[in-house]
């Protein structure tokens, strides 16, 4: 399955919530009719069955993190194998992706931009270049921008945007050095309440 390359706001309208696919700190519901379905007239969304609600939640989370269907299912299987709450394990695995950590640290304005930085070999983990977006960052790992990439205007612009966002408590970032430490895995209370991971567990448990 190919990665979606179409209009980002269209996806957010389809899911009925901001998927944080666009750069900036202003919520996109001020830019577009987030409550309406995509299309010229924004037809009213049909009432969904329980399965439909579960499927929409899975699609929403998958799109937030920019993960393809097969990858997402594999994350769920891994989360189910781990000790603890499967839904919380799933979110922790998604948050631990290198592209997401780069975004959370403020080096990329969006997860897509952070993924591009990783694939272009602009990111190091513990002093070594890693160009795999799905690489799982471990507690106490140091993530940094390569020296030759520090002058990129998009990195500087992303850091300026990050100053306006709430800083994740599980990360420690030195914007001047363009590096940060993944102190710990985020707890459920650290993450968005707009995500209902229980619906995803119910979907895959069938």
Curated annotation (Swiss-Prot):
InterPro entries: Ribosomal_uS4 (IPR022801), Ribosomal_uS4_bac-type (IPR005709), Ribosomal_uS4_CS (IPR018079), Ribosomal_uS4_N (IPR001912), S4_RNA-bd (IPR002942), S4_RNA-bd_sf (IPR036986). Residues 96-156 form the S4 RNA-binding domain. One of its GO terms (biological process) is translation. Keywords: Ribonucleoprotein, Ribosomal protein, RNA-binding, rRNA-binding. Pfam families: Ribosomal_S4, S4. Disulfide bonds: none annotated. One of its GO terms (cellular component) is small ribosomal subunit. One of its GO terms (molecular function) is structural constituent of ribosome. One of the primary rRNA binding proteins, it binds directly to 16S rRNA where it nucleates assembly of the body of the 30S subunit. Part of the 30S ribosomal subunit. Contacts protein S5. The interaction surface between S4 and S5 is involved in control of translational fidelity. Belongs to the universal ribosomal protein uS4 family. NCBIfam families: PRK05327.1, rpsD_bact. This is Small ribosomal subunit protein uS4.
């Amino acid at each position: 399955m190919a990665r979606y390359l179409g209009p980002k706001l269209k996806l957010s309208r389809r899911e009925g919530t901001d998927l944080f696919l666009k750069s900036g700190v202003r919520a996109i519901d001020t830019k577009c009719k987030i409550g309406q379905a995509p299309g010229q007239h924004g037809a009213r969304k049909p009432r969904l069955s329980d399965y439909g609600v579960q499927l929409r939640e899975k699609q929403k989370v998958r799109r937030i993190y920019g993960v393809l269907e097969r990858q997402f299912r594999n994350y769920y299987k891994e989360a189910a194998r781990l000790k603890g709450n499967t839904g919380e394990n799933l979110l922790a695995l998604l948050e631990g992706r290198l592209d997401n950590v780069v975004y959370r640290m403020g080096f990329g304005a969006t997860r897509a931009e952070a993924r591009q930085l990783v694939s272009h070999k602009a990111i190091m983990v513990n002093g070594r270049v890693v160009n795999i977006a799905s690489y799982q960052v471990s507690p106490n790992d140091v993530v940094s921008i390569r020296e030759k990439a520090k002058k990129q205007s998009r990195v500087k612009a992303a850091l300026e945007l990050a100053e306006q966002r709430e800083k994740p408590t599980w990360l420690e970032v030195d914007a001047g050095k363009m590096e940060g430490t993944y102190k710990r895995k985020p707890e459920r209370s650290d993450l968005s309440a707009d995500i209902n991971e229980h619906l995803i567990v119910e979907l895959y448990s069938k």
